[in-house]
Each structure stands twice: as structure tokens, then as C-alpha cells.
A protein has these predicted regions:
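Proline-centered loop/turn at the N-terminus of a beta-strand
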Residues: 34, 134-136
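Conserved P-loop
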Residues: 5-95
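Short, polar loop motifs at secondary-structure junctions
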Residues: 142-143
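Phosphate-binding/switch loop-helix module in NTP-utilizing enzymes
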Residues: 73-133
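Positively charged, low-complexity intrinsically disordered leader regions
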Residues: 1-2
């Protein structure tokens, strides 16, 4: 990545935010950089990124940290359970960021987690403030 890392935000309506971040990840892995993607909304059910990430190890680590989509796709979990998972995801982010093991960390759907009230904006600001200088940090999600 770069000598001074960036904070990049992909937001807006429609599709393409996660895809853009994955494009950055693929490029980084091509340069033998270490990448971690922490997904705030997607749960552990099977989806394409899981299969792709296995092919990119050890340079790419995917952590599906969410409980799953909130209030859709047959979700019956109480909001408090989604909040607990999101708060645990924030702790995972802190650990990964402070480990200085990664060149690029993607916080997928973190913006949407804030919008839904699963985490507060201050916790996101703290992640940004505490990132190592060389780390590229990508935040995705609508809102």
C-alpha cells in the first residue's frame, strides 16, 4: 500500500461498495500485502467471499463477525443480539488494527452497523484515530 496509509470510505445507495473494497484487497494480495476483512453484518452462512478468501490465504483473512442481516432474510434475532455481535466485531477490529500485522483492513458494512444503531460512531472514530500510520483502512456500507 502506501507509506502513509489512507482511510477510504465506500458509501452510497446500490451495489458495489464491498466489491470495490474486495478489488483493493485483491490488488494488495497480489503485492504480497496482508489483508483482513471484518464483516459487520454478514453472518456465518455461506456466500461467495468465503470461498474466494480461502484461495487467497495466508495473505487474506476474512472474519464474518456479524449475526447476519438485521430484520431481513428470515432474521428473528433480537436487536440486542445483533448489537452484541457488532460490539464484539469492534473489539476484533481493535485487536487486528493494533497488531500491526496487516497492510489493509476492511471494515465491511460498518457504516450500516452505525446507521442501525448496533455500534456508536465514536467507536468507529477511535478505530480511525488509533490506526498505525502505514495502515490503509477501508470502511464500507450504506449511510
Amino acid at each position: 500500500m502506501t507509506e502513509d496509509g489512507f482511510v477510504i470510505v465506500y458509501t452510497g445507495g446500490g451495489k458495489g461498495k464491498t466489491t470495490a473494497a474486495l478489488g483493493m484487497a485483491l490488488r494488495a494480495v497480489g503485492y504480497q500485502h496482508k489483508v483482513c476483512m471484518i464483516q459487520f453484518i454478514k453472518g456465518s452462512w455461506h456466500y461467495g467471499e468465503m470461498d474466494s478468501s480461502k484461495r487467497l490465504t495466508p495473505e487474506f483473512e476474512l472474519i464474518p463477525a456479524g449475526k447476519g442481516f438485521v430484520g431481513i432474510l428470515d432474521d428473528t434475532s433480537p436487536k440486542e443480539e445483533h448489537e452484541r455481535y457488532a460490539k464484539e466485531a469492534i473489539e476484533t477490529c481493535k485487536e487486528k488494527i493494533l497488531s500491526e500485522k496487516y497492510d489493509l483492513i476492511i471494515l465491511d458494512e460498518i457504516n450500516y452497523a452505525v446507521h442501525l444503531g448496533l455500534i456508536n460512531i465514536q467507536s468507529v472514530i477511535e478505530l480511525i484515530k488509533n490506526k498505525p500510520k502505514k495502515l490503509d483502512l477501508v470502511l464500507t456500507g450504506n449511510h
